[in-house]
């Protein structure tokens, strides 16, 4: 991802396209409005911002739910490839998956999540706020970055659609369809096993990751609109 990427996502509530930097504040307005419109709500929910460079998720987690629910969600949308182990960390210490959110989370708290202890994918989490809102879902997706405009590292003109997992280092290994065909002639590994799709996840190009199982409409390559 060496070209200048624009990271933005669509708000679940109003459908507006909002930049990564502004999304937390934007969602807060909607959540405060929900809280004010339902003053008798008893449930506690937490707005959590999950980030890996230009890729991000904003989710609303139910206080009664556990870290196991968020782990399952992250696996389905960003991580799962071969059933690797995963772990949440708070100030460097492990957080048990059975711990409930309302036992741990407070506004401003920062955590980390690690998937796969070999070819590791690490993301950061920050609790943006807590609200009195009744919610059925354990984890509700509020926003996710749209697919990033990752350019081919060979021609630097067309959008990349494939990755060579052997050559994916510092600005290399991303190919458009035409350049991927040429790279296949030069790289036996690419034709054999190293060709992988560009997907909207920080796990792309790693291990056997081929894409998520939920929110699949935003899991592909960038399309100009």
Task: Describe every region a protein language model picked out.
Residues 1-225:
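Short linear regulatory motifs enriched in tryptophan with gly/pro/ser
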